[in-house]
C-alpha cells in the first residue's frame, strides 16, 4: 500500500499554472482517497503528460533527471530492493556511490522516502528524478519477476555459449568435468565473468561471511556489490573457481595462486589471475582481469598534458638512463610502462622484462616471470639480461638494494631501464632509494625521469552537471586567483544508463620530475623529499594536486574525485 501523497507538488503545480489551484487540490484529494501517489494519479488519468511533468519538476526542484528506461535494472544492488519500502513510497533505489544511495522517484517532494531508505540501510540518500510511467514499468518488472536464488532466468544462453575455459586450463584431470548438480554454478559463474568483462571490471571478489556470500566488482577503482547468492553455495563457488584456475581443490588452509584463460569467442580470450585466501567463513577468491588491450594504449589516452607527454617521450628516446614510475597499487603504473615499451618495441630494439607476475603478453618483448622460490628473482633476472645484449630493460619493481644497484649499473652502461617503486610522490622516490642504501652519486647520475601517478575516474559526458563551489573553497583546494578571475566551469557526477554513478573510465594524473643539476646537487647533499620537491616545482614540475585540479578545470573529472586521489 503506497503512502498518502503530500501537498508539496500540488502547491507547486498550482503556482505554475499547469493546474488551477482548485483542480490541483481536487486531484490531490482523489489521489488520497484512492491511496495512490499524486503523480501516479495525474499520469494514469492523463491529466498531465509524464515527460512534461518530469521536465517541470527538474526545473522547479533542481533534481537531476534520469532516463530510467535506458537504465539496466540488472545493475541495481539486490540488497536495497526492499519491496515494502518500494511499494510504500513508489520509488526505486538504483545505485550507490560511496555512502550515498540514489533513489529514483517521480515526485521529488517525497522526502519521507529518502528518510525511510536512509534509516533502513544506514546511508545518506539522494533523489534522482524519473518519468512516472517509466518508474511504474521498472517497479513492475522488478517486483513481478519470479527468480530463483541465483536469478538464472536472466541469463541469455546465447550470450555465454562460447565462454569456456581454454584448453590449456581444462587439460587437468577428470575433475574439470561438471556434474548436472554443478551446471547451475558453472552457468552462474560464466554469467558473472561475462558481466565483469562487459562492465570493464578490473577485479572480481567472491567473499564468504557467516550469514552472507557477496560478489563484488571493482570498476574504475571502486568496489560495487553485484550479487549476494545463497551462503550455502560458498564451497561450490570456490571449488568451481579453483578447478578453472588449476588449483588444488582439497587445499583450503593455505593461499593459492593460479590463472584462468577464458575463451570468449573463436578469436578472443581473456587472461585472469586468481588468488585464494582462507578466512573464518571459507575461501575468499579474488580474480584480476588482465586486459591485453591496456598494453596497446596510445600515449594520447593516458592523460598527459602536452608538456608531460613531451617529457616522457624525450626520456624514452634516450639511449640510457633510468625511468621510474611510482604510485600505490592500482594507480596505473603497469599501463604507463607498457605504453612506453610499445613505443620502443621495434625490430631494431631488444627489450627484456622481469615481472611478478607477467600480466599482459607483449609480442616482440622477452618477458620473464620471476620465481623467487626457484631462485629467479628480479636481481638474478637483471644479471642475466645484461648478458643478453639488451637495449631496454624493464624491472617490475625495485624492492631491495641488490635490485636497485644492478638496475643503476645497467642504466649507467648504455641501457634504458624502466621500473616502479611504491612511493607517494616523485621526490619521495629519490629519498626511498637513498634509504635503501643506494649511493647518492649513483642516483644522481642514472635517474633521468621520475613519474608519480594516480588514476581518477572520468565524468560521464552524457550526464555530468555543472557544479557551483564557493570561491573561498576553490582557493583552499589549490586553484589560483588568476584561474578564478578567468572563470571556472566545474562539473559533478549525476548517473545515467551509460555510466556507473556518474563516472565512466579513468584518466591518469601525473607528476613528472626531471633530473636537473639543482636536484642532483640536493641529492648529493642528502636533502629530504620536501626540499627536492620545492626545487622541482620552481623548475616547472606540476604536482599531482595541480595536475588533478587542471583535469577538473577542463571538465574531465570532479573536484570530489581529485580530493579522493590526491592531497593538498
Swiss-Prot record:
Superkingdom assignment: Bacteria
Binding site for ATP: 327-334
GO biological process: pilus assembly; protein transport
Family according to the record: Belongs to the GSP E family.
Record-level GO cellular component terms: cytoplasm; plasma membrane
PANTHER family attached to this UniProt entry: PROTEIN TRANSPORT PROTEIN HOFB HOMOLOG, TYPE II SECRETION SYSTEM PROTEIN GSPE-RELATED
Disulphide bond pairs: none
Purpose: Involved in the translocation of the type IV pilin.
Name by which UniProt lists this protein: Type IV pilus assembly protein TapB
Gene that this polypeptide is encoded by: tapB
One Gene Ontology term of the molecular function aspect: ATP binding
Listed InterPro entries: ATPase_typ4_pilus-assembl_PilB, P-loop_NTPase, T2SS/T4SS_dom, T2SS_E_N_sf, T2SS_GspE_N
Cellular compartment(s): Cytoplasm
Gene3D superfamilies linked: 3.30.450.90, P-loop containing nucleotide triphosphate hydrolases, Type II secretion system, protein E, N-terminal domain
Organism name: Aeromonas hydrophila
Amino acid at each position: 500500500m503506497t503512502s498518502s501523497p503530500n501537498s508539496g507538488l500540488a502547491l507547486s503545480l498550482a503556482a505554475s499554472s499547469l493546474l488551477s489551484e482548485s483542480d490541483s487540490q481536487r486531484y490531490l484529494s482523489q489521489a488520497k482517497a484512492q491511496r495512490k501517489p499524486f503523480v501516479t494519479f495525474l499520469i494514469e488519468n492523463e491529466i498531465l503528460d509524464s515527460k512534461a511533468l518530469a521536465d517541470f519538476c527538474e526545473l522547479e526542484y533542481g533534481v537531476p533527471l534520469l532516463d530510467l528506461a535506458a537504465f539496466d535494472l540488472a545493475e541495481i544492488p539486490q540488497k536495497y530492493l526492499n519491496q515494502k519500502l518500494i511499494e510504500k513510497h513508489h520509488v526505486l533505489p538504483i545505485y550507490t556511490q560511496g555512502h550515498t544511495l540514489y533513489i529514483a522517484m517521480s515526485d521529488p517532494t517525497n522526502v519521507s522516502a529518502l528518510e525511510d531508505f536512509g534509516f533502513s540501510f544506514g546511508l545518506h540518500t539522494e533523489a534522482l528524478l524519473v518519468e512516472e510511467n517509466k518508474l511504474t514499468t521498472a517497479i513492475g518488472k522488478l517486483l513481478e519477476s519470479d527468480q530463483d536464488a541465483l536469478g538464472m532466468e536472466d541469463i541469455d544462453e546465447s550470450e555465454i555459449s562460447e565462454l569456456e575455459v581454454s584448453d590449456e586450463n581444462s587439460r587437468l584431470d577428470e575433475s574439470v568435468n561438471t556434474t548436472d548438480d554443478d551446471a547451475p554454478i558453472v552457468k552462474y559463474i560464466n554469467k558473472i565473468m561475462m558481466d565483469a568483462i562487459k562492465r570493464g571490471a578490473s577485479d572480481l571478489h567472491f567473499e564468504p561471511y557467516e550469514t552472507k556470500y557477496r560478489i563484488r566488482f571493482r570498476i574504475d577503482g571502486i568496489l560495487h556489490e553485484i550479487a549476494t547468492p545463497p551462503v550455502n553455495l560458498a564451497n561450490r563457488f570456490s571449488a568451481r573457481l579453483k578447478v578453472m584456475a588449476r588449483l588444488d581443490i582439497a587445499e583450503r588452509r593455505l593461499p593459492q595462486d593460479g590463472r584462468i584463460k577464458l575463451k570468449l569467442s573463436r578469436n578472443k580470450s581473456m587472461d585472469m589471475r586468481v588468488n585464494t585466501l582462507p578466512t573464518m567463513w571459507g575461501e575468499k577468491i579474488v580474480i584480476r582481469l588482465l586486459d591485453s588491450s591496456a598494453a596497446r594504449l596510445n600515449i594520447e589516452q593516458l592523460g598527459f598534458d602536452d608538456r608531460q607527454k613531451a617529457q616522457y617521450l624525450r626520456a624514452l628516446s634516450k639511449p640510457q638512463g633510468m625511468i621510474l614510475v611510482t604510485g600505490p597499487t592500482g594507480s596505473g603504473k603497469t599501463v604507463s610502462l607498457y605504453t612506453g615499451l610499445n613505443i620502443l618495441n621495434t625490430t631494431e630494439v631488444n627489450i627484456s622484462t622481469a615481472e611478478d607476475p607477467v600480466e599482459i603478453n607483449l609480442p616482440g618483448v622477452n618477458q620473464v616471470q620471476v620465481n623467487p622460490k626457484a631462485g629467479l628473482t628480479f636481481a638474478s633476472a637483471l644479471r642475466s639480461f645484461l648478458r643478453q645484449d639488451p637495449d631496454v630493460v624493464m624491472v617490475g619493481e625495485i624492492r631491495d638494494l641488490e635490485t636497485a644497484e644492478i638496475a643503476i649499473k645497467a642504466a649507467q652502461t648504455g641501457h634504458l631501464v624502466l621500473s616502479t617503486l611504491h612511493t607517494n610522490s616523485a621526490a619521495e622516490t629519490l629519498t626511498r632509494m637513498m634509504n635503501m642504501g643506494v649511493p647518492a652519486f649513483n642516483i644522481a647520475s642514472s635517474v633521468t625521469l621520475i613519474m608519480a601517478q594516480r588514476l581518477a575516474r572520468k565524468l560521464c559526458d552524457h550526464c555530468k552537471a555543472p557544479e557551483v563551489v564557493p570561491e573561498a573553497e576553490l582557493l583552499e583546494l589549490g586553484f589560483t586567483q588568476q584561474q578564478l578571475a578567468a572563470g571556472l566551469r566545474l562539473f559533478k557526477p549525476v548517473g545515467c544508463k551509460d555510466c556507473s554513478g556518474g563516472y565512466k573510465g579513468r584518466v591518469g594524473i601525473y607528476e613528472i620530475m626531471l633530473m636537473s643539476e639543482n636536484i642532483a646537487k640536493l641529492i648529493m647533499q642528502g636533502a629530504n623529499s620536501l626540499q627536492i620537491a620545492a626545487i622541482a616545482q620552481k623548475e616547472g614540475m606540476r604536482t599531482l594536486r595541480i595536475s588533478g585540479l587542471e583535469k577538473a578545470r577542463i571538465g574531465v573529472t570532479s573536484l570530489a574525485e581529485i580530493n579522493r586521489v590526491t592531497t593538498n
